[in-house]
């Protein structure tokens, strides 16, 4: 509670226009980095995205051949640049300098899956031609461009021979997208720096992160005999932290009247691209929305949710899939703040509202499983939020005289660190290089490895007010943004790590 009360004071500490400019040596270092390494960082990004560093179930990332090759590439580049390199399994650490105090720069080299059919070229090949000015690839924004940029920012610091009061350690996690346990295990053998900056989010400076939550609800029921149409399958989505772009539904027993009603509803909903395919009295409906990171569901169009609304109010034969559709229409809808889901909706004055994303639906022999991603601000404990989720689901089942579906939850606390000393210099760097004099600290819905480290905040790589493309099927970073990031990351390192008076 104390940290909640201190947040207004934190914001008041950084009024619009406040903060000095970066010192001269930081500005000079940034200029050197841009002059010498702006093109080189893009070349390194092209090398890094070629590695398909996607988690494969049943195989530890640190042991996977693609990850091993990726780590080897980082080691070779670090040694070429004159840095030391240590492999801790779940993380690798690339270091510059031998000062006792240390500055940690946190990033990650693993990426989310990508559907090749949705990319003009292979998602694991840097495409700088299809859309001039954009560097398109899986990992371009999240988080391989920041790795390439940080390495060249460190190289610029080394070139200039700046004396260091803090050793710089670039910490590259290998499991940020799938499992944080290997990072936690590495921290039993690696003592983290006391000052840390993650480069896995957005600007100006991220000082708070919403809690991450998953809710899985499984409906098990055999289709009962009857004359009503029977939903045979309801499926879509790729992974938990993505707004689903694709969804499909197969329904038997469709007559002309139902088909006409569905056609009319689809025509009224132009947010989604619809495809209807009939075979006898069987109808397959496909919906195409827009993928986005599930921490920013407002940037996406949820194909699963919109597909469910097409069948709202229709009498359907009881089945696992029909129960799932009713659940979605009753408790989720096409909103993103949980207003329909019992009492779960709430907001925090700094961190913003709870968001709810229906991420995936899977139809199996056991039934239909819905996976829902929640991003929860401060203001409710995980225990309270879980109770409200379960109460709402129980009320839904009771009202329909249905057995309670299988419910699995995993909820974490919001991240609200005390005010770290690096916030003011980072804001000054951002204000200097962007001209945004009113920039202040922000909160995000995403969850990053920053919360595993002491005194950690996020600084980029994405600009405020610009849709984030990580986790989407159209991930890119602009060429202009990479240059700007190189300036700001170099200035940041020179200011916080160099001993220049």
Label each PLM-derived region with a short phrase.
Residues 19-116, 371, 477:
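N-terminal helical capping/dimerization or prosegment-like subdomains
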Residues 102-172, 176-178, 473, 478-484:
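Active-site metal-coordination/substrate-binding segment of hydrolases
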Residues 143-222, 256, 263, 271, ...:
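Acidic/histidine-rich catalytic neighborhood of metal-dependent amide-processing enzymes
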Residues 216-217, 222, 242-250, 254-261, ...:
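A short core secondary-structure module
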């Amino acid at each position: 509670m104390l940290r909640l009360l201190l947040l207004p004071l934190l914001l008041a500490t950084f009024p619009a226009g406040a903060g000095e400019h970066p010192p001269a040596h930081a500005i000079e270092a940034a200029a050197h980095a841009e002059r010498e390494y702006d093109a080189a960082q893009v070349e390194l990004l092209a090398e890094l995205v070629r590695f398909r560093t996607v988690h494969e179930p049943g195989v530890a990332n640190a042991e996977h051949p693609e990850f091993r090759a990726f780590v080897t590439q980082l080691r070779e580049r670090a040694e070429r640049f004159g840095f030391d390199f240590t492999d801790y399994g779940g993380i690798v650490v690339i270091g510059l300098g031998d000062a006792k105090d240390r500055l940690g720069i946190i990033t990650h080299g693993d990426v989310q899956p990508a559907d090749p059919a949705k990319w003009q070229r292979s998602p694991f090949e840097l495409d700088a031609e299809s859309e001039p000015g954009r560097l398109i690839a899986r990992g371009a924004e999240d988080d391989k461009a920041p790795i390439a940029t940080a390495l060249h920012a460190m190289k610029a610091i080394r070139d200039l021979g700046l004396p260091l009061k803090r050793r710089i350690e670039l910490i590259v996690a290998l499991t940020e997208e799938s499992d944080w346990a290997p990072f936690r295990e590495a921290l039993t053998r690696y003592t983290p720096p006391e000052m840390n900056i993650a480069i896995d989010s957005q600007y100006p400076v991220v000082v708070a992160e919403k809690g991450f939550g998953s809710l899985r609800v499984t409906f098990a029921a055999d289709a009962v005999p009857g004359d009503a149409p029977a939903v045979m399958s309801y499926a879509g989505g790729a992974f938990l932290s993505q707004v689903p772009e694709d969804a499909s539904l197969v329904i038997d027993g469709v007559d002309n009247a139902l088909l006409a009603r569905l056609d009319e509803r689809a025509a009224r909903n132009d947010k989604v691209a619809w495809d209807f395919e009939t075979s006898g009295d069987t109808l397959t409906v496909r919906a195409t929305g827009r993928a986005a990171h599930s921490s920013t569901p407002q940037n996406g169009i949820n194909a699963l949710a919109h597909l469910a609304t097409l069948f709202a109010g229709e009498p359907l034969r009881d089945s696992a899939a029909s129960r799932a559709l009713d659940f979605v229409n009753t408790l989720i809808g096409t909103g993103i703040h949980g207003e329909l889901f019992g009492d779960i909706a709430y907001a925090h004055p700094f961190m913003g509202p709870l968001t709810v994303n229906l991420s995936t639906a899977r139809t199996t022999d056991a039934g239909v499983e819905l996976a829902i991603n929640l991003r929860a601000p401060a203001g409710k404990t995980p225990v309270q939020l879980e109770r409200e989720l379960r109460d709402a689901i129980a009320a839904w089942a009771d009202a329909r005289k249905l057995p309670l579906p299988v419910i699995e939850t995993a909820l974490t606390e919001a991240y609200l660190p005390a005010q770290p000393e690096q916030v003011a210099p980072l804001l000054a760097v951002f204000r200097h290089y962007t001209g945004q004099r009113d920039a202040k600290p922000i909160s995000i819905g995403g969850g990053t490895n920053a919360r595993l480290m002491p005194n950690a905040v996020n600084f980029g790589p994405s600009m405020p007010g610009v849709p984030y493309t990580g986790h989407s099927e159209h991930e890119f970073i602009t060429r202009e943004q990479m240059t700007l990031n190189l300036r700001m990351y170099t200035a940041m390192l020179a200011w916080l790590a160099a001993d220049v008076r």
